[in-house]
């Protein structure tokens, strides 16, 4: 046996000089056309962290699955109960919540924002959110039409998720996929990545490696 785990006098073991593991990032996409950038987002994070990905049924219309990093598993609603056979078997949305250090939804559609704010959990993604441990960081990067972004419901929903402790990576103003010009475009994958990584590393420094 390798000598990296000496036995204490009390019989307990303790790893010594073990290499720190990579951060575990759970990336999720909901049904916005900005999900065309999801594979790029996964590539950004996979160079730094262990990544698992979740997609809603609507987001699959836009995600190029062939462009996803080969080492990133993409979970869909079909996976939620496919491995569950009997009481005691693992439940995917619970296991993903346990696994992740940080969750990031990018893009966050108006529909999924409304579901989260209302506590709904009718797919894999929203079940993870409903079961999330809010002592762990959670980021969202909304993407929607300018009029949807400016809708009074959106303001109410953003207040609700802020009260949960979810951090907002705000949308940007540009020409949108629908042709309109205005605020509502998802932040660039590089911006989302740098925001989350800076947060993680600053917290790790403050807490000697723990976030």
From Swiss-Prot:
Subcellular localization, as worded in the UniProt entry: Cell membrane; Nucleus
Keyword entries, A-Z: Cell membrane, Coenzyme A biosynthesis, Decarboxylase, Flavoprotein, FMN, Growth regulation, Lyase, Membrane, Nucleus, Stress response
One of the record's GO cellular component terms: plasma membrane
Listed transmembrane segments: none
Pfam families: Flavoprotein
Cofactor(s) demanded: FMN
Enzyme class: lyase
Alphabetized GO MF terms: FMN binding; phosphopantothenoylcysteine decarboxylase activity
Superkingdom of the organism of origin: Eukaryota
Tissue/organ expression: Mainly expressed in roots, to a lower extent in stems, and at low levels in leaves and seeds.
Pathway: Cofactor biosynthesis; coenzyme A biosynthesis; CoA from (R)-pantothenate: step 3/5
Annotated cofactor note: Binds 1 FMN per subunit.
Induction record: Induced by salt (NaCl), lithium chloride (LiCl), sorbitol, cold and abscisic acid (ABA).
Marked site (Important for catalytic activity) residue numbers: 178
Primary location: membrane
Catalytic residues (positions): 93, 178
Catalyzed reactions per annotation: N-[(R)-4-phosphopantothenoyl]-L-cysteine + H(+) = (R)-4'-phosphopantetheine + CO2
InterPro entries from the UniProt entry: Flavin_trans-like, Flavoprotein
EC number: 4.1.1.36
Residues at which N-[(R)-4-phosphopantothenoyl]-L-cysteine binds: 145, 175, 177, 186
Binding site for FMN: 31-33, 56-58, 109-112, 143
Subunit structure: Homotrimer. Interacts with CYP2 in the plasma membrane and nucleus.
Family: Belongs to the HFCD (homooligomeric flavin containing Cys decarboxylase) superfamily.
Record's function text: Involved in plant growth, and promotes salt (e.g. NaCl and LiCl) and osmotic tolerance, probably via coenzyme A (CoA) and endogenous proline accumulation. Catalyzes the decarboxylation of 4'-phosphopantothenoylcysteine to 4'-phosphopantetheine, a key step in coenzyme A biosynthesis. Favors seed germination and helps the onset of flowering. Required for roots development.
Extra remark beyond the main annotation: The cv. Suxie No.1 (SX1) is more tolerant to salt stress than the cv. Tianlong No.1 (TL1).
Protein name, as recorded: Phosphopantothenoylcysteine decarboxylase HAL3a
């Amino acid at each position: 046996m390798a000598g990296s785990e000496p036995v204490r006098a009390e019989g307990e073991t303790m790893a010594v000089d073990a290499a720190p593991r990579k951060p575990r990032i759970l990336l999720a996409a909901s049904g916005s056309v900005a999900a065309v950038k999801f594979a790029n987002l996964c590539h950004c994070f996979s160079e730094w962290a262990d990544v698992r990905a979740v997609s809603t049924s609507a987001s699959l219309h836009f995600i190029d699955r062939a462009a996803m990093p080969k080492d990133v598993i993409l979970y869909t609603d079909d996976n939620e109960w496919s491995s569950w056979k009997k009481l005691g078997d693992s439940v995917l949305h619970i296991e993903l919540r346990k696994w992740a250090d940080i969750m990031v939804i990018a893009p966050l559609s108006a529909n999924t924002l409304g579901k989260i704010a209302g506590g709904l959990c009718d797919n894999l993604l929203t079940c993870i959110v409903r079961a999330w441990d809010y002592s762990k960081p959670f980021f969202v990067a909304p993407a929607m039409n300018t009029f949807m972004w400016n809708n009074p419901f959106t303001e109410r929903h953003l207040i609700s998720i802020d009260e949960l402790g979810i951090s907002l990576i705000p949308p940007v103003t540009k020409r949108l996929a629908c042709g309109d010009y205005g605020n509502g475009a998802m932040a660039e994958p590089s911006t989302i990545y740098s925001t989350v990584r800076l947060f993680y590393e600053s917290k790790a420094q403050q807490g000697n490696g723990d976030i």
